[in-house]
Amino acid sequence: MKKIIFLVLFLIFIFKDIKSSYGVDLVNFKMITLLSNNFNDLGFNNMLNQGKVNVEKQLGITDTKVYIVDGYNDTKALLLPMVQNEDVDFVMCTSLGHVEACKEIAKMYEGSLTIKTQFMVRGSSNATSNLLQVTYNYASINYISGVFAGLYTKTNKIGFLSPGLLGGSADCFVYAYWLGAKQINPKIEFYYYNIGAFLNSDKTTRATAELLDMGCDVIGDTLDDFSAGNTVISRGFKALGTNGFPQREVYGENVVFSYSYNWTKIFLPIVKNALVKGKPKNNYADFNIDPTLNFYDISYGFDVPQDTKTKINDTISYLKSTPRAIHPTNCNDLMLKYAEKWNLTMSTTYDRTKCIAGSNFFFINEPFPGMTYFGYYNITNTQVKFSPSIQIGVSIVSGVLIAIVLLSMVGVYKYRASSSIRSASPIFLIFILFGALIVFGGIILWVSELNDHVCNGRLWMVTLGFSTLIGSLVVKNFRIWLIFDNPELKTVKITNYQLYPWVACCLVINIILMSILTSLGDLREVDATGIDSLGKYEFLKICKMNNSGASVLYTILAYFGALLLTGVFVSWKIRIVDIEEFNESRAIAHTLYAISFCLFVIVPLMISPLEKQSETIILSVAGLFITTAAVLIIFLPKFYRVYEYGEEGTNEMFKSKKSSNIATARAESHKSSNSGNHRTNRRGNLVSGDFTDDSESSVIEPNQEVADVTSGAVLADFTEESVSEIDENEKNHNDEIELPEINQSEQQNSEIEQPPPPPPPQQIEPDEKNQD
């Protein structure tokens, strides 16, 4: 028990001793450190953090925090609430980006009785009651780095990277590097870029690569990280470690020269003074004759000649023993002309013909004669283009299909007199082919280099093409339905001129919707970044529209869906047509089914996230497949029959008198329900010679007598071309109708006298033969 009491008393004594040594309760001493970037950067921030950690260890400070922040607004927003509410004793603002915000907060509470926080910032202005400033001679170490570069280069071409004014640092330090190299090696050529920030690894890497491509074999920088050095090493050169971190400890002999900052020597006396609430004192760091105060530690590679080391060490000794105001960077033969050109002030204390005023050194920003300045480095985004092989392949296939469609048009025109072509109406076949032609052209645009016109044009072409193709198919199907869904066999006039408005209506709807999309949708080409698998500096040209345009596009898709569903429904209604001659209805149905199936596959794919190139490939291939399938299904059987049976249609199906079971059944059913009003068919077997392009599909007047529904009658109804010659006779021969040839018995049974005053209807007894 006595031992425990003794141990407690001993600890209390030690604690009191610590408190009395520094005059402050270390347990309650709170310190905050602000860094501009992560301290794992193997550069400037790493060394700052290392100095902070060493101070904490030596002084026994435990309540410390590190925050990564940069810029005035962010720094103030972070720091001010902590100073107001957390009783912070000391704040180290280590970056130039912290200076303004930290100065402003310090001024707000200068002389405050409640907030005793002291601030450390970068700079050389006068200290205040709660603010001190720290600076180090960055020009001298860059001058030494330049001396090494001038001695070590083999190509006499050296380069440099700096943040520039936009990054918060004038190029006076670039000048110091160049001057050291030029004075030791007058033959050197010097090239440099501004990066625009202390930390931008992407720009640094690319700018370094360009300097290497120019022939530079030694490259220095005043940036925070080691991106430049990594690029140099990756290209097989030796790197310089010029960002304050001992790079040779990490990269070994790949780094031929490096210097490091010893921030512990700067921070330790400053924090000690803050512990005792002493008056803030500024601090200055540089090469120093006293090793305990020397801020820079230099390390060389094994292959550096001793003569080079000797020259550098002699230069460092000169800098240590010479006032900063007359260092070579401030006083030289080039300075007077430069100062006169850029309105800088020369020194009033030292040689006015060579020495610039100390404060004016930091206004040196423009290049001296002999310095080649390339400006701020900008990364040009690289366009990722659509796969050339896919683009060429789709274009070639589309071109071949266009040629096939054109040949098909020629074939339709050439064989328009053949029964196979005439039975399907050549003009509608041309419509279908023309729609396919437009679609194939749109597919070529779909995989072409994008611009605003292509974005709009390809959508116009594809939608108009499909409207023409599908609209013609649906209208033809609708005609079939009207003809076969006619149990009373009444007169049904369906001429081509009656069908044209329906096709035109499909196109008009499409044009209206596309016009709305074009005017309101803002459909245009944009350079998209950050999509798919694009790199940070890559872009892809895509077509983009606003929400209004997307809504109209969905409306267009819904319109096509309704058009297809109508076609599918009508095709289903005529599925029971059993006459082989009219199997085009099934072909049209198959086409619509194929299109519907493809669309139901495509739409979910389009809704789900896809890479733009994959989306383009799917849409292009689907468009080619749908259109090609439609053309083949409709036209291949027709041209085969032309090839097989000749232009005159020798196939017996156009001459046989085959009855339609469906139509006959409907006629007989209607006959049984209308006894006493029996009809006979007066049209007989109409041959294909009666067909023209302006047909009137019809059945005889309802009050005439009919005997049977034959294939000839149905064929006449379907082909659109059966009685246009009769129409012409009605127009040109004073309403005389030349009826088709019928048999003698039907003629005798159908004669009706027509005296001037019409007598009561004469009852005609039909032949037994026609009773069946």
Curated annotation (Swiss-Prot):
Q: Where is the composition biased (Acidic residues)?
A: 718-728
Q: Where is the composition biased (Low complexity)?
A: 740-753
Enumerate composition-biased segments (Pro residues). Answer: 754-763
Question: Mind telling me which residue stretches traverse the membrane in this protein?
Answer: 392-412, 427-447, 464-484, 501-521, 552-572, 587-607, 617-637
UniProt-annotated location(s): Membrane
Segments on the Extracellular face: 24-391, 448-463, 522-551, 608-616
- Swiss-Prot/TrEMBL GO biological process terms: G protein-coupled receptor signaling pathway
**GO cellular component term, pick one:** plasma membrane
Please give one Gene Ontology molecular function term for this protein: G protein-coupled receptor activity
Positions of the region Disordered?
664-772
Specify the glycosylation sites in chain numbering: N73, N126, N262, N313, N343, N378, N546
Q: What span is annotated as the signal peptide, if there is one? A: 1-23
Record's keyword annotation contains Glycosyltransferase: no
Instruction: Give membrane topology per the record.
Output: Multi-pass membrane protein
Q: Which family is annotated? A: In the N-terminal section; belongs to the BMP lipoprotein family.
Q: What is this protein called?
A: Metabotropic glutamate receptor-like protein G
Q: Which organism is it from?
A: Dictyostelium discoideum (Social amoeba)
Gene expressing this chain: grlG
